[in-house]
Amino acid sequence: MARRSEIEAALRRLAPKIPPHEFSAVVDHALDSAGLRTASPENAAWLSLVSYLRHAFTDYEELLTQGYDRDSARFFVADEMRAMLEQWGVQRKLGTDD
């Protein structure tokens, strides 16, 4: 099975209600990220999903520009991310390291 197919299958299991456009963007992010090349398909799908949500659907980057450190910015967007994960049918809980 090709890497793309493995990540797609992992993402479908992880986020069964994710919209098609978002699905493609998350898979592309997982494949394009140098840091995820050696990750298991499941970890690549999860880490890419979390990163995509944080950057595309929250004020995370704005908080960083306002001078918040990474951990503080992540704290302030966590509830918004949890709500989106729930909408997309994700059962896995967002951890403090995510």
List the predicted regions and their residue ranges.
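Structure-specific DNA junction-binding interface
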Residues: 1-98
